[in-house]
Amino acid sequence: MKIVIDLMGADHGVLPIIEGVSRALENKSFSVVLVGDKDKATPFISKELASKVEMIHTQDYIKMEEAATEAIKRKESSIYLGMDILKNGADALISAGHSGATMGLATLRLGRIKGVERPAICTLMPSVGKRPSVLLDAGANTDCKPEYLIDFALMGYEYAKSVLHYDSPKVGLLSNGEEDIKGNTLVKETHKMLKAYDFFYGNVEGSDIFKGVVDVVVCDGFMGNVVLKTTEGVASAIGSIFKDEIKSSFKSKMGALMLKNAFGILKQKTDYAEYGGAPLLGVNKSVIISHGKSNARAVECAIYQAISAVESQVCLRITQAFESLKSQSFESQSDQQDA
């Protein structure tokens, strides 16, 4: 298995990415192609690691303040070169750089899976249960039609089943209430269409994401990104509040010591790094979009995520799902019309 790693554009430079690759190679067997500035990367690459990776040198990359459309013009940029390597035989690509550039190039260079109108960013959200919830779209498509959300539901369902190995995953539609009549025009129209699928649970509220009421939560990219960023902010704020309160007295410090294991589990469940990155579903190869501020652990977990996606053949599974499940929807709608 060959995984392409974009070294450029992350908030903390190349070091966390290289450290993450090194840690992953200690636990998994895979080939690595690093794409980026060799002069910046070499000081952090040990002789042992150098023997395990291939390095493609380029100094160009799409900066965060640049438009995503720049990516298609800059054929020597790290993400363009990386996407070409993926297109021509590699199995997966991971980038913590410009997410818009990654999404745009993946769609244009790799192509969409037949039947998919819009690829979507799929992210894992912590829940009170033993397994996380899947949320999509987390930011790829801010303006959506009902048909797009149907695609997101199909892809999220297949990802939960094939990659995460959830039995009979249930899909919920994010709304401002559980009742069928709740929601804006987009939600109401999507709800009518999703009723044709056996996996559809119904509407869910924001709080249900973290209760694990359903396995997959579907929404437009604007709402999904707001949910994601709000969750990150709340988790960070709670962590800061805990730290301040623990330091406030000797009694608090002793209590924290007794609850050390519980705090460790809480941190693991709410730490974005443990979830790796966000798969871009709907394109013909596995692409993982990592957080710009990714540390070594986040990169390591993103690699494991990519390996799982490739081993489970998620792109093929989604292709097959669109052939069979969309047929199920068509037959169901035809039966309703005949009735």
From Swiss-Prot:
This entry's Gene Ontology molecular function terms read: phosphate:acyl-[acyl carrier protein] acyltransferase activity
Taxonomic superkingdom: Bacteria
InterPro entries noted in UniProt: FA_synthesis, Phospholipid_synth_PlsX-like
Any matching Pfam family: FA_synthesis
* Location of the protein in the cell: Cytoplasm
Q: What are the protein's UniProt keywords?
A: Cytoplasm, Lipid biosynthesis, Lipid metabolism, Phospholipid biosynthesis, Phospholipid metabolism, Transferase
Principal localization reads cytoplasm
Output the GO biological process annotations, alphabetical, semicolon-separated. Answer: fatty acid biosynthetic process; phospholipid biosynthetic process
Gene3D superfamilies, alphabetized: Isopropylmalate Dehydrogenase
Task: Give the reactions, separated by semicolons, that this protein catalyses.
Answer: a fatty acyl-[ACP] + phosphate = an acyl phosphate + holo-[ACP]
Task: Give the residue range of the signal peptide.
Answer: none
Q: Which Enzyme Commission number(s) are listed?
A: 2.3.1.274
Keyword Endoplasmic reticulum carried by entry: no
| Pathway membership | Lipid metabolism; phospholipid metabolism
| EC supergroup of this enzyme | transferase
Q: How does it assemble?
A: Homodimer. Probably interacts with PlsY.
Family indicated by similarity: Belongs to the PlsX family.
Functional note: Catalyzes the reversible formation of acyl-phosphate (acyl-PO(4)) from acyl-[acyl-carrier-protein] (acyl-ACP). This enzyme utilizes acyl-ACP as fatty acyl donor, but not acyl-CoA.
Q: Which PANTHER family match?
A: FATTY ACID/PHOSPHOLIPID SYNTHESIS PROTEIN PLSX, PHOSPHATE ACYLTRANSFERASE
HAMAP family named among the record's database cross-references: PlsX
Protein name stated in the entry: Phosphate acyltransferase
